[in-house]
A protein has these predicted regions:
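Hydrophobic micro-packing sites on short alpha-helices
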Residues: 113-118
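Short, charged, surface-exposed hinge/linker loops at domain edges
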Residues: 1-3, 41-103, 107-112, 126-133
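DNA-binding alpha-helical recognition surfaces that contact promoter or target DNA
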Residues: 37, 101, 119
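DNA-contacting interfaces and partner/effector-binding or oligomerization modules
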Residues: 1-55
Length: 133
């Protein structure tokens, strides 16, 4: 079974875009749910189109697949608007101005910064899981 990693981002129209490293597999929508539904539809359409052209399905389709959704930072802040980008930046140890650029999609984070952000985010989630009301 193949895992298809699909990245959720903020689209230029203010909605959501989803992309992968597989050519042609994209989705979009005004909401995250719409974009995911569109992405799944395109995935099936692309497999059918490939079959029409070659009489075989793509490897990722024949072997079975699961979709792992990930966020880029613009998509993360769009999906979770109650998280303040500047405060989150301070928590994860990144310049707040740079984080706001990530949020708006003007700049993409490096692999090193993604790792740093993910590690601090995981720490934050562990801390939040201990909270009781």
């Amino acid at each position: 079974m193949r895992t298809i990693t699909a990245t959720i981002e903020k689209a230029s129209d203010g909605g959501y875009g989803i992309y992968t490293d597989i050519p042609g597999l994209i989705g979009s929508g005004l909401t995250e749910e719409e974009a995911k539904a569109d992405f799944c539809g395109v995935l099936k359409e692309q497999a059918a189109y490939y079959y029409e052209r070659t009489t075989t399905y793509p490897d990722w389709y024949e072997e079975g697949y699961e979709i792992e959704y990930r966020y880029d930072l613009s998509g993360f802040f769009l999906s979770f608007p109650f998280i303040n980008a500047s405060e989150f930046a301070s928590y994860v140890g990144i310049n707040p101005s740079l984080m706001r650029k990530y949020k708006s999609g003007l700049v993409k984070d490096s692999a090193k910064q993604k790792d740093q952000i993910q590690a601090k985010y995981n720490e934050m989630i562990r801390n939040l899981e201990r909270v009781k009301f």
